[in-house]
């Protein structure tokens, strides 16, 4: 795991000082080493976090054996041992079979030498890779198929191009435009994050997962080397025994190869199904006790520490635990907002930063359980996607919405879930947004100043059209499968994986996600929906598999999620955030919202409408970012 940055531009447009400033912004991603390459129109920078092959010979930028290619690379390719052996066996007696290091980086570069852009199909791992062809004067950038590792890029009309692992590194360039994208603000208020390929800035983009970007003197070309929506065709697996055997075998192998490391490692253990299963399988491959790390809260409604403790005790791990108070969280708020570089509202990032800090005292690599809920239907959103297509909801949806709205505030979310125009709504996105208690478009139109409403209307039409295009041809898929695909493509990548990457890298540790192993993802996409939710049990295959290692009474309980008691804290210890960022002066300064509507929302929240907490938090996060950065 590392931090990378680079430029491709007319000589002199980007200065060496620019890219060095970017490198300073990435220091936390790679405190173990620094490397720089410059030639004609190209500059490449690398900050190293040493995980595999700690020798300086494995440092980057790394050149190919003949000097034609230069690479900077962030991530890990877990099957590098097998790939290296394949190269050696296939090229015995040639320079291609000779390696100077034991690193995965050299294997990645050698594969590119042999296969060109097609090399990426061989890689099982997480990565953001940049390779410069000195002969053809071309820059190739690749992002892994699940979007685990981040990569941002900038371009202008004159052909100047720059990239970096984090947004803050690109905004360190003085010559890069930092004009805010209003559509990204609308996106944020709908989702709580800004989805790929957008960022908060107009001319800076996230490179989408499974994508290759080719930059040359003649321009930029972008193409997909792996597309999620193309992986769901064909016959589905519905034999439970067969699925469980395959799942056990593939996940066991995924955990095994992701434990490859030359530095100490451990596991984030929440006590939930996914992290417990990863921990159980990891204990089969370690000598001695495995380090596990968890976070708890004093508020018992949000405290899962006892469950993590029970799993750790059963599996015999060396368990580390930290109980979070509101004061611990307050001390992190400013850092939390700054780490993500753009508006971001997932407050589970705060406990993730705290558990990362705890882990960093003991290890340099952690395994985490992201991906299980999205691949195996673990959320309430998947249940709602089924309900909304069945009686009585599909027949009496509108009157039921009106009825639920008249009831107490605890039913407001159900009322909003049922309220949508089927001709203008991409249902999976609507379900996700309302399940998160976020704004629907009618609420946004009522909240925004009149001068922004026409722009919002145009955005809502583009929004629906974009989703319809992305998921075209999948309308006949089960509703829960479509929900899963949406959540893999957007919330998983741009919220959860972003959260884990920034939180861990802030403390210079590497997070790995075995449930997003290439082979496991392919298997999960082939499993029939009827097996993922069976007998009313979400994530049925994962729970059946976990029962082989951990007693069901430890893990069979309602899902809570890795969240903080935000609604309570915003009324007590964190009330100052509402006072500081949602007062009349700030609302007027930002110039997006009607003051009377924001005040009304705050009054309702204090009067008992707790469901408004996430909307208020989004406004706080947005206002805070705009005030600080504009």
Placement of each model-derived feature along the sequence:
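Cysteine-centered catalytic environments shared across enzyme families
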Residues: 1-340, 352, 356, 548, ...
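Adenosyl-5′-phosphate
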Residues: 1-4, 21, 172, 203-208, ...
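Acceptor-substrate binding/catalytic loop of class I
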Residues: 344-346
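Conserved glycosyltransferase catalytic-site signature
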Residues: 104-105, 124-126, 182, 348-353, ...
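Short low-complexity, flexible loop/linker segments enriched in glycine and/or proline
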Residues: 334-338, 360, 382-384, 569-571
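A mobile, often basic/glycine-rich helix-loop segment
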Residues: 376-401
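Alpha-helical "lid/cap" subdomains adjacent to substrate-binding clefts that gate access
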Residues: 394-418
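Short acidic/histidine-rich active-site segments
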Residues: 363-373, 377-379
């Amino acid at each position: 795991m590392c931090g990378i940055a680079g430029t491709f531009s007319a000589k002199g447009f980007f200065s060496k000082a620019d890219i060095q400033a970017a490198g300073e912004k990435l220091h936390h991603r790679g405190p173990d080493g620094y490397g720089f390459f410059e030639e004609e129109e190209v500059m490449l920078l690398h900050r190293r976090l040493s995980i595999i092959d700690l020798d300086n010979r494995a440092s980057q930028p790394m050149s190919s054996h003949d000097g034609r290619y230069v690479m900077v690379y962030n991530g890990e390719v877990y099957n590098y041992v097998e790939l290296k052996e394949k190269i050696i066996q296939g090229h015995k007696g040639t320079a291609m079979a000779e390696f100077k290091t034991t690193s995965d980086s050299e294997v990645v570069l050698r594969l590119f030498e042999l296969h060109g852009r097609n090399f990426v199909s061989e890689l099982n791992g997480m990565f953001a890779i940049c390779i410069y062809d000195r002969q053809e004067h071309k820059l190739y950038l690749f992002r892994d198929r699940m979007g685990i590792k981040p990569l941002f890029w900038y371009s202008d009309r004159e052909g100047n191009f720059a990239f970096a692992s984090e947004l803050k590194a690109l905004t360190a360039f003085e010559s890069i435009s930092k004009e805010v994208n209003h559509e990204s603000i609308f996106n944020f208020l709908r989702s709580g994050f800004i989805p790929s390929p957008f960022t908060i800035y107009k001319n800076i983009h996230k490179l989408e997962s499974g994508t290759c970007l080719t930059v040359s003197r003649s321009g930029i070309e972008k193409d997909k080397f792996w597309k999620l929506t193309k992986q769901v065709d064909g016959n589905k697996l519905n034999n439970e025994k067969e699925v469980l055997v395959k799942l056990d075998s593939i996940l066991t192998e995924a955990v095994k190869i992701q434990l490859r490391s030359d530095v100490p490692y451990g596991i984030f253990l929440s006590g939930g199904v996914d992290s417990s299963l990863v921990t159980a399988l990891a204990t089969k491959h370690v000598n001695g006790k495995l380090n596990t790390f968890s976070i708890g809260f004093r508020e018992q409604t949000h405290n899962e520490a006892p469950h993590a403790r029970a799993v750790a005790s059963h599996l015999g791990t060396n368990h580390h635990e930290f109980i979070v108070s509101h004061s611990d969280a307050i001390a992190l708020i400013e850092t939390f907002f700054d780490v993500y570089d753009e508006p971001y509202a997932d407050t589970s990032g705060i406990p993730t930063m705290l558990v990362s800090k705890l882990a960093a005292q003991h290890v340099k690599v952690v395994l985490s359980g992201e991906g299980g809920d999205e691949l195996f239907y673990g959320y309430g959103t998947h249940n709602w996607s089924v309900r909304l297509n069945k009686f009585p909801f599909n027949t009496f949806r509108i009157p039921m919405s009106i009825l639920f709205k008249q009831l107490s505030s605890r039913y407001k979310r159900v009322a909003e879930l049922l309220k949508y125009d089927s001709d203008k709504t991409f249902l999976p996105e609507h379900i996700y947004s309302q399940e998160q208690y976020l704004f629907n478009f009618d609420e946004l139109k009522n909240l925004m100043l009149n001068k922004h409403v026409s722009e919002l209307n145009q955005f809502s039409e583009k929004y629906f059209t974009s989703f319809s295009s992305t998921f075209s041809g999948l309308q006949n898929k089960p509703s829960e499968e479509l929900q899963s695909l949406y959540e893999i493509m957007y919330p998983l990548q741009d919220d959860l994986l972003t959260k884990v990457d920034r939180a861990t890298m802030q403390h210079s540790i590497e997070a790995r996600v075995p449930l997003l192993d290439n082979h496991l993802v392919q298997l999960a996409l082939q499993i029939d929906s009827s097996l993922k939710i069976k007998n009313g049990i979400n994530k049925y295959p994962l729970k059946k598999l976990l029962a082989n290692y951990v007693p069901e009474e430890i893990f069979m309980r309602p899902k809570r999620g890795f969240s903080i008691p935000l609604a309570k804290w915003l009324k007590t210890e964190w009330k100052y955030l509402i006072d500081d960022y949602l007062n009349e002066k700030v609302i007027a300064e930002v110039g997006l919202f009607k003051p009377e509507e924001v005040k009304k929302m705050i009054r309702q929240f204090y009067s008992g409408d707790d469901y408004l907490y996430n909307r208020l938090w989004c406004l706080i996060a947005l206002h805070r970012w705009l005030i600080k950065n504009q």
